[in-house]
Amino acid sequence: MKNINPTQTSAWQALQNHFDAMKEVTLAELFAKDADRFGKFSATFNDQMLVDYSKNRITEETLSKLLDLAKETDLAGAIKSMFSGEKINRTEDRAVLHVALRNRSNTPILVDGKDVMPEVNAVLEKMKKFSEAIISGEWKGYTGKPITDVVNIGIGGSDLGPFMVTEALRPYKNHLNMHFVSNVDGTHIAEVLKKVNPESTLFLVASKTFTTQETMTNAHSARDWFLKTAGDEKHVAKHFAALSTNAKAVGEFGIDTANMFEFWDWVGGRYSLWSAIGLSIILSVGYDNFVELLSGAHEMDKHFSTTPFEKNLPVLLALIGIWYNNFFGAETEAILPYDQYMHRFAAYFQQGNMESNGKYVDRNGNAVDYQTGPIIWGEPGTNGQHAFYQLIHQGTKLVPCDFIAPAITHNPLSDHHQKLLSNFFAQTEALAFGKSRDVVEQEFRDQGKDPAQLENVVPFKVFEGNRPTNSILLREITPFSLGALIALYEHKIFTQGAILNIFTFDQWGVELGKQLANRILPELGDNKEIASHDSSTNGLINRYKAWRG
């Protein structure tokens, strides 16, 4: 994987010049010039997904220059490096192989000369057997009752991915009730424990090291709660399993290491739902549906690693994102799923993107002088329309948006889905083409009103348009199509990081706060006044101590 400053390439300079010619061009003009624009700037994946990127402020020349940037920064080499098991996470000396976790072809993938696939398959088989015992009721709790509730205790990648997927795939869920606890705020675990019975609850403790502060604090609280009823510590083994690699700590906790599911240092947390961290997904929707999820992602992996860039969906979406981020100065991207089951999708890729590409140091260790990762946010439609779309339509900030929707709903109630999709289609049209002053005035005339008398209102009803969007239409949200969609975004993020010359797979930015919290925690153990920090931190700690009593 080469270290190339993108701004020093001839392609970047060409894009800068091209931007000067494009910045005033409107989407209305682009569509008026080309009746086949949709045909040229859209593509279908596996007859399951349509990606329409025609409502972007791009031309064929724009894409050509962006593709030149991908070539000049050796994106092809970066993709090959990742898929071949090279240690592209150099700051932690690790390979990056979430693609191996869903490698349904089972072709060998080597790390340090060793094929990782036998171990991947062994853990999958172990999860299959365990999940089947739980789901079937064969596995019994300490009083002989089958498991009814599963509580996943994890944080970050050990929580966001499994929670997002189990919510997205709720139509496929079985009888088990799923709960997720992440926050070290005791309220989170306390509220979940109110809902479950210790005799029929299984806790999954998801921590690679089995030392993560938030996760282990919650796990010990769950264990204490359980033992208040169960009494004997030997019963812990019937009600707790671990997603970890620290067999010693797992055993000391009281978990049978036969119920410890391993993953490897080449699995990054925010790319780990495909690993043992996905056990909660299997328990929710069954092993076969989990395999379908893996299969959908694997198909997207094949597309990403083998398709020429000009037809490569993750690459195209990544390049369009760079176009807005680095040339138009757009600071954010909104992810807007028109499906209530997908309500955690934006939050998941908020971590996926911002923890991956929120870096100001390049792969050479130098501070960058260009923009890297964007701010990611979003909510499901149509809720967002009644909240923040006002700013997207008429605000002063450029917010490129991804609209996502299924053609087929899992809940065909009355005409709900047609109304939902009519909004989906209308919003991208409105954002692209807006409403001119002439149209506003004509609407007033059609209502029998005199535009001249309404001069003070007309400007506020004008929509400039020219707001860019991608539309991703899925045939239906299934385990397969969801797997493909997640992998699409994963590879988009990797592509942008590769081109922008940053390390996408470390996350040193989360460390400093943790270090300082560990330093401050002992200071909160008494009521002595603190003077060891800056005046603000001292003031906050001392007021906290005064108020807590």
From Swiss-Prot:
Name the UniProt key words of this record, in alphabetical order. Answer: Cytoplasm, Gluconeogenesis, Glycolysis, Isomerase
Query: Which protein family is it in?
Result: Belongs to the GPI family.
Superkingdom as given in the UniProt entry: Bacteria
Q: Which Gene3D superfamilies match?
A: 1.10.1390.10, Glucose-6-phosphate isomerase like protein, domain 1 (3.40.50.10490)
A Gene Ontology annotation in the biological process aspect, one of them, is: gluconeogenesis
- NCBIfam families cross-referenced by the UniProt entry: PRK00179.1 (NF001211)
Which GO molecular function annotations are given, in alphabetical order? carbohydrate derivative binding; glucose-6-phosphate isomerase activity; monosaccharide binding
The UniProt function text for this chain reads: Catalyzes the reversible isomerization of glucose-6-phosphate to fructose-6-phosphate.
Q: Which GO terms describe its cellular component?
A: cytosol
What Pfam families is this protein classified in?
PGI
Q: Look up the record and name the pathway of this protein.
A: Carbohydrate biosynthesis; gluconeogenesis; Carbohydrate degradation; glycolysis; D-glyceraldehyde 3-phosphate and glycerone phosphate from D-glucose: step 2/4
The EC number(s) given in the record are 5.3.1.9
What PANTHER family does this protein's entry cite? GLUCOSE-6-PHOSPHATE ISOMERASE
- Please verify whether the record's keywords include Isomerase: yes
What's the protein called, per UniProt?
Glucose-6-phosphate isomerase
Q: Which reaction does it catalyse?
A: alpha-D-glucose 6-phosphate = beta-D-fructose 6-phosphate
- Organism ancestry: Bacteria, Pseudomonadati, Pseudomonadota, Gammaproteobacteria, Enterobacterales
Q: Indicate where this protein resides in the cell.
A: Cytoplasm
Q: Which residues form the active site?
A: E355 (proton donor), H386, K514
Gene from which the chain derives:
pgi
